[in-house]
Amino acid sequence: MKNLNTYSQKLRESGLRPTKQRLKICEVLFSPERTFHFTVNDLTKIISEKLSEKISLATVYNTVHAFKKKGYLKEISINSDKSYFDTNVSEHHHFFDEDTNELIDCGIDEIDSVNIKKNITGKKIKSVEVLIKVATDNQNQN
């Protein structure tokens, strides 16, 4: 019951009505056992299986983007066509495996400091997020 109230509150704070489908989205996203990466399509599929009924892509898309805007999720853009979302909103970096399309967390202490040489007048750096894309090195395979 406590989680249901928490989920309803998150939805309301994000400007959304707590419907059965949106509450199910929250149940999957904010389960305390784990954090994970997903695309909107991935999440739609997971929710449909968990609900044993269809959920509209638009409902999932709008809910995810409302949560992102509120700071409950982080968006990681892989390219102009693909974005992943992360339920771990703490400061960290990512590896993206182009062979498996897997996004892998990388702690901020696992990358030496980034040396930023450009300064924009009147602005300060709020955060630095690094996305490192990796793929199989075919040159070293026999």
What kind of region is each of these model predictions?
Residues 1-26:
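Short alpha-helical segments that sit at the start of domains
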Residues 11, 47-50, 67, 118:
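Hydrophobic alpha-helix position signal
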Residues 16, 31-35, 50-51:
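Short helix-capping/hinge SLiMs at alpha-helix to coil transitions
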Residues 24-27, 42, 59-62:
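Amphipathic alpha-helical interaction segments
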Residues 39-52:
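DNA-recognition alpha helix
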Residues 60-70:
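Basic amphipathic alpha-helical segments that dock to polyanions
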Residues 70-142:
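Non-DNA-binding regulatory cores of transcription-related proteins
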